[in-house]
């Protein structure tokens, strides 16, 4: 029997609200285990990778890197129609992320003789993690590799868990080829993150690790962030839907089910001003849960779901901003009213014909997004995750002279005499005398 939280938002207890909004990621529960695996990978390299792949993925591998022959076999096994669909999605992803590219170098004169600028430089290397296990995610390969390539990253590798026979799903390998990955490794979980962070005999160390994963992968990313930069915590998937009586109950329910099939820990929430819609969605969710292919996962996930009835649209918006969802769907008559008031959301889907799967696969926006409330402080994966910025100063003698007294006064106030003298020497002062 599926049980979802169903009540008026104003009647929900403090404990119920805290559970929904905090929706604990479980990072603390797995931290010690993750730390142990990471340490082992750092010390023993490939030997540790083989051991953990056998333990967690139940497969013994002779080697981790996907060979060219395996790529060719995979591509021959993917039908031309499916390959074309990959290319359609890839094209949209590429166009959207190209639009995000900043001017490589720019300058401005803030006052005569003082020219300032900024230079954007791509990272040298990036490791993309694509989950496996319950399903293969070629779409995640596109979402992580293509922006890195658009940004100009020189080396992009992919780690994804092997199947029971030691292979990688052909469509995942096809996606890696379409996206432009340099290498693909048959590695998943904590050990994959450790390999990319520290480097092993086989896996090169990277500057940054991006991509979603389960709580173990997320914990691993958080723990290695002083060795290799990461994008953000991206754990179990979630959606919050703001709807009014103009929304279609079957559509809303199908979007809840779609999110629930990702993972038993996925979170799906509807907040609506319509009691009639709320009840209709609840009934529709129960019906659809029985008939979907991944019914058991969906039913488990729905234990984390909620249907909440708000007094006003403003109350719905306020709750959404506190919840800070990974995915936010807006299915109301006046969508701009809601959109303009949203502060915290990873990706926003506006209207009845913009369900989350559109962004998951083919619209072109990125589906690697912060979860568990981290949308309050993080942006979804974008071109800037693959770039770093250097500020530039071009100062003439007259420009420095105009700032001389200000710099000297502030440096001396901070007790940094040599800083002040570095300015004076450019105007005849000899600090050695």
UniProtKB/Swiss-Prot annotation:
One GO cellular component term noted in the UniProt record for this chain: cytoplasm
GO BP: L-histidine biosynthetic process
Annotated protein name in UniProt: Histidinol dehydrogenase
Function: Catalyzes the sequential NAD-dependent oxidations of L-histidinol to L-histidinaldehyde and then to L-histidine.
InterPro entries assigned to the protein according to its UniProt record, in alphabetical order: Ald_DH/histidinol_DH (IPR016161), Histidinol_DH_CS (IPR001692), Histidinol_DH_monofunct (IPR022695), Hstdl_DH (IPR012131)
Catalytic activity: L-histidinol + 2 NAD(+) + H2O = L-histidine + 2 NADH + 3 H(+)
NCBIfam families in the cross-refs: hisD
Positions that bind NAD(+): 129, 191, 214
Gene Ontology molecular function terms on file: histidinol dehydrogenase activity; NAD binding; zinc ion binding
Family: Belongs to the histidinol dehydrogenase family.
Database matches in Pfam families: Histidinol_dh
Cofactor annotation remark: Binds 1 zinc ion per subunit.
Keywords recorded for this protein, A-Z: Amino-acid biosynthesis, Histidine biosynthesis, Metal-binding, NAD, Oxidoreductase, Zinc
Binding site for Zn(2+): 259, 262, 360, 419
Cofactor(s), by name: Zn(2+)
Known EC number: 1.1.1.23
Residue numbers binding substrate: 237, 259, 262, 327, 360, 414, 419
Listed pathway(s): Amino-acid biosynthesis; L-histidine biosynthesis; L-histidine from 5-phospho-alpha-D-ribose 1-diphosphate: step 9/9
Family matches, as SUPFAM superfamilies: ALDH-like
